Amino acid sequence: MNLAEENTIFKPLYSLKHSSINAYFSKNSDDFVVRERPLYEFSGKGEHLILHINKKDLSTNEALKILSEQSGVKMRDFGYAGLKDKQGSTFQYLSIPKKFESFLSNFSHSKLKILETFTHENKLRIGHLKGNSFFIRLKKVMPSDALKLEQVLMNLDKQGFANYFGYQRFGKFGDNYKEGLEILRGKKMKNIKMKEFLISAFQSDLFNRYLSKRVELSHFANDFSEKELLQIYKISKEEAKELKKQEQFFKLLKGEVLGHYPFGKCFLCEDLSAELERFRARDISAMGLLIGTKAYETGEGLALNLENEIFKDALEFKAKMQGSRRFMWRYLEELKWRYDEEKAHFCIEFFLQKGSYATVVLEEILHKNLPE
């Protein structure tokens, strides 16, 4: 990002080219359901009590406050694998010290239910989940739009999707990355958690901008000639030829950082032909930069040039951030859908690995920005 343009709220490019689809979506507890999938089975023994809860139209923090008030558990003693959105119905797991079990025996709340409990050896930590399954109901869908939805879903199932950070990451007005930048420039903030969150929003915004640049490159590689690619990216004839040869939508680049999919270590793309085979088999994927001192460094070539274009003005703040890598390209799993023509409802279900946003997938499907 050119920091001179930091006041521009960024809208990422879509990977698919269809026109927008008419459908009504409301993120409520009937039409948006999230089910967290644990990373491991709970052991049935230990000093921690795992609560399987269902919350409706409550944020995770609001649910914790309710439980804290009725049980006496301090907020810091709760464990959870991930924060969930306020809107919708969410099934997720929390942990508390087992000694508080008796205080929850008479728990009752209209928007929060404890479905079952387990015992386990350790407290739940951020990231202790495999991912989330989603149910989304679209309304006011006419038959012609239902056909478009089916085609789009088949395309997404085949090619995957750009793993952008969702609008939730950037606050109500979509611009909290600006506050993160101000903190990096020296603005003081006492709330450590909020400070870290705002800085991460700045990192996330840069990640989205770089991923959008890669989506643009992939479109150009499909649509333009080798000669035009030479002029746009100032690359060699061999590099342009390699781009044109790649049949999958998202193009890999020699010298970029890859990772074993869906979990695994980072490494550099040195043998492009070999890595393309593994990418098409969904064994590896490309990793985008969350800028910081601990992030795996890109090697060379066009990947490095494009990265520098986005991140060059943020390098002066690199030492203030730890950084990491995040998958740029991911895949829908367990995808299914059904259309009820009489009700004009189109229901979609899928599973996403942890860290991916269902709303990002829905924006790609509908070609509309959320929330509307």
UniProtKB/Swiss-Prot annotation:
<keyword id="KW-0819">tRNA processing</keyword>
<dbReference type="InterPro" id="IPR020103">
    <property type="entry name" value="PsdUridine_synth_cat_dom_sf"/>
</dbReference>
<feature type="active site" description="Nucleophile">
    <location>
        <position position="85"/>
    </location>
</feature>
<dbReference type="InterPro" id="IPR050170">
    <property type="entry name" value="TruD_pseudoU_synthase"/>
</dbReference>
<keyword id="KW-0413">Isomerase</keyword>
<comment type="function">
    <text>Responsible for synthesis of pseudouridine from uracil-13 in transfer RNAs.</text>
</comment>
<dbReference type="InterPro" id="IPR011760">
    <property type="entry name" value="PsdUridine_synth_TruD_insert"/>
</dbReference>
<dbReference type="InterPro" id="IPR001656">
    <property type="entry name" value="PsdUridine_synth_TruD"/>
</dbReference>
<dbReference type="Pfam" id="PF01142">
    <property type="entry name" value="TruD"/>
</dbReference>
<dbReference type="GO" id="GO:0005829">
    <property type="term" value="C:cytosol"/>
</dbReference>
<feature type="domain" description="TRUD">
    <location>
        <begin position="160"/>
        <end position="330"/>
    </location>
</feature>
<dbReference type="InterPro" id="IPR042214">
    <property type="entry name" value="TruD_catalytic"/>
</dbReference>
<comment type="similarity">
    <text>Belongs to the pseudouridine synthase TruD family.</text>
</comment>
<dbReference type="GO" id="GO:0031119">
    <property type="term" value="P:tRNA pseudouridine synthesis"/>
</dbReference>
<dbReference type="InterPro" id="IPR020119">
    <property type="entry name" value="PsdUridine_synth_TruD_CS"/>
</dbReference>
<protein>
    <recommendedName>
        <fullName>tRNA pseudouridine synthase D</fullName>
        <ecNumber>5.4.99.27</ecNumber>
    </recommendedName>
</protein>
<dbReference type="GO" id="GO:0160150">
    <property type="term" value="F:tRNA pseudouridine(13) synthase activity"/>
</dbReference>
<dbReference type="GO" id="GO:0003723">
    <property type="term" value="F:RNA binding"/>
</dbReference>
